[in-house]
UniProtKB/Swiss-Prot annotation:
<keyword id="KW-0408">Iron</keyword>
<comment type="similarity">
    <text>Belongs to the IspH family.</text>
</comment>
<feature type="binding site">
    <location>
        <position position="124"/>
    </location>
    <ligand>
        <name>isopentenyl diphosphate</name>
    </ligand>
</feature>
<feature type="binding site">
    <location>
        <position position="12"/>
    </location>
    <ligand>
        <name>[4Fe-4S] cluster</name>
    </ligand>
</feature>
<comment type="pathway">
    <text>Isoprenoid biosynthesis; dimethylallyl diphosphate biosynthesis; dimethylallyl diphosphate from (2E)-4-hydroxy-3-methylbutenyl diphosphate: step 1/1.</text>
</comment>
<feature type="binding site">
    <location>
        <position position="74"/>
    </location>
    <ligand>
        <name>dimethylallyl diphosphate</name>
    </ligand>
</feature>
<dbReference type="Pfam" id="PF02401">
    <property type="entry name" value="LYTB"/>
</dbReference>
<feature type="binding site">
    <location>
        <position position="74"/>
    </location>
    <ligand>
        <name>(2E)-4-hydroxy-3-methylbut-2-enyl diphosphate</name>
    </ligand>
</feature>
<feature type="binding site">
    <location>
        <position position="227"/>
    </location>
    <ligand>
        <name>isopentenyl diphosphate</name>
    </ligand>
</feature>
<keyword id="KW-0414">Isoprene biosynthesis</keyword>
<dbReference type="GO" id="GO:0046872">
    <property type="term" value="F:metal ion binding"/>
</dbReference>
<feature type="binding site">
    <location>
        <position position="227"/>
    </location>
    <ligand>
        <name>(2E)-4-hydroxy-3-methylbut-2-enyl diphosphate</name>
    </ligand>
</feature>
<feature type="binding site">
    <location>
        <position position="226"/>
    </location>
    <ligand>
        <name>(2E)-4-hydroxy-3-methylbut-2-enyl diphosphate</name>
    </ligand>
</feature>
<feature type="binding site">
    <location>
        <position position="269"/>
    </location>
    <ligand>
        <name>isopentenyl diphosphate</name>
    </ligand>
</feature>
<feature type="binding site">
    <location>
        <position position="74"/>
    </location>
    <ligand>
        <name>isopentenyl diphosphate</name>
    </ligand>
</feature>
<feature type="binding site">
    <location>
        <position position="124"/>
    </location>
    <ligand>
        <name>(2E)-4-hydroxy-3-methylbut-2-enyl diphosphate</name>
    </ligand>
</feature>
<comment type="pathway">
    <text>Isoprenoid biosynthesis; isopentenyl diphosphate biosynthesis via DXP pathway; isopentenyl diphosphate from 1-deoxy-D-xylulose 5-phosphate: step 6/6.</text>
</comment>
Length: 309
C-alpha cells in the first residue's frame, strides 16, 4: 500500500504557542493551572495537560479566587476579560494572534458603529469570543454560515457594513458566502487580507493537491476541531472517501478493502505522534511505502508572553 503524507500538517504556530503557554505556566507555577475551555481542540493534548496539572473549565465561576487562568487559543469575549480583571485573576492569554487580529477588526467596527457580519459556525468558541468584541447598540453584529443565511439577513444600514470570518473555515465555502454578501451589499467592506489563517489555507491546499491521487483520506483530529472537519469535508468534495480519526484506535480495517493508495494528514491541533501511530496501524494491514508529499514550508513562530519565557 502507498501511504502519502500531506504537507504541511499538524500543529500550527498558534497551537504551538497555546500549548507552550500552558506547559510553561505549569513549570513556573504550582498546579492547578486553570484553562478556560480546551486550550486547543484535541483530546490527546488536553488529556496530557490534565495529567500534568491543568484544570479545564468552561466558565470563570469555576476558577477559585487568587488562581491563574489561561484563555484558550480560540479567544474570549470582552465580558470574560472584564470578569477576570474584576476578580483579580492572574491571566495568561493563549488566544491565537490571528484570532486577535479579527477581534481588533470587530472592536474597531463597534467603536465606529459599523454593523459587522461574522462568517462562522454557531456555537464555536472562536465565534463566541469574536462576537463578544462588539458592544455598540447603535450598530450590531450578525452571524452567517451560508449564502442562505445571507439571503435572510436584515441589517440596519446596508451602506455601513463590514465582514470578518472565523479563522478555521473552508476557503471555498467562505468565498461563496463573501460573494453573496458582496452581491447583496455592494458597499460592504472586508478585511485587507483574508481572515482565514495561513495554516488553515496551507493544510486545505495540501489536501486539495493529494486527494485525487488516492482512494482514501485519513484526517487525524478530534471531532470538535473545526479545521480538521474542514479537511475531511474537502477530501470528500474531491470525490475521495475520507474519515476523521482521533487516533489509531479509530482506524477501521474495512476502510482499506481494495485500497492501494491512502493519504494521511492532521488538523492544526493534532500532534505528529498521532499521525505516526495512524501510519503504523495502516502499515500493519499491508506492506506499505510511506511518501512525504512536498508542500508549503511554514516558519511562522508566535512568542509566548514575556513572563513565561
Amino acid at each position: 500500500m502507498n501511504i502519502l503524507l500531506a504537507n504541511p500538517r499538524g500543529f500550527c504556530a498558534g497551537v504551538d504557542r497555546a500549548i507552550s503557554i500552558v506547559e510553561r505556566a505549569l513549570e513556573l507555577f504550582s498546579p492547578p493551572i486553570y484553562v478556560r475551555h480546551e486550550v486547543v481542540h484535541n483530546r490527546y493534548v488536553v488529556q496530557n495537560l490534565k495529567e500534568r496539572g491543568a484544570v479545564f473549565v468552561e466558565e470563570l465561576d469555576q476558577v477559585p479566587d487568587d488562581s491563574i487562568v489561561i484563555f484558550s487559543a480560540h479567544g474570549v469575549s470582552q465580558a470574560v476579560r472584564a470578569e477576570a480583571k474584576r476578580r483579580g485573576l492572574k491571566v495568561f492569554d493563549a488566544t491565537c494572534p490571528l484570532v486577535t487580529k479579527v477581534h481588533l477588526q470587530v472592536a474597531r467596527a463597534s467603536r465606529k458603529g459599523i454593523e459587522c457580519i461574522l462568517i462562522g459556525h454557531a456555537g464555536h468558541p472562536e465565534v463566541e469570543g469574536t462576537m463578544g468584541q462588539y458592544d455598540n447598540s447603535a450598530g450590531g453584529v450578525h452571524l452567517v454560515e451560508s449564502p442562505e443565511d445571507v439571503a435572510k439577513l436584515v441589517v440596519k444600514d446596508p451602506d455601513n457594513l463590514c465582514f470578518v470570518t472565523q479563522t478555521t473555515l473552508s476557503m471555498d465555502d467562505t468565498a461563496d458566502v463573501i460573494s453573496s454578501l458582496q452581491k447583496k451589499y455592494p458597499s460592504i467592506e472586508g478585511p485587507r487580507k483574508d481572515d482565514i489563517c495561513y495554516a488553515t489555507q496551507n493544510r486545505q491546499d495540501a489536501v486539495r493537491n493529494v486527494a485525487e491521487e488516492v482512494e482514501l483520506f485519513i484526517v487525524v483530529g478530534s471531532k470538535n476541531s473545526s479545521n480538521s472537519n474542514r479537511l475531511r469535508e474537502l477530501a470528500q468534495k474531491k470525490g475521495t472517501q475520507a474519515f476523521l480519526v482521533d487516533n489509531a484506535d479509530d482506524v477501521d480495517a474495512t476502510w482499506f478493502n481494495g485500497v492501494e493508495r491512502v493519504a494521511v494528514t492532521a488538523g492544526a491541533s493534532a500532534p505528529e505522534v498521532l499521525v505516526k501511530q495512524v501510519v503504523d496501524a495502516i502499515a500493519k494491514m499491508a506492506p506499505s511505502v510511506v511518501t512525504e508529499v512536498e508542500g508549503q514550508l511554514e516558519d511562522t513562530v508566535f512568542a509566548v508572553p514575556a513572563e513565561l519565557r
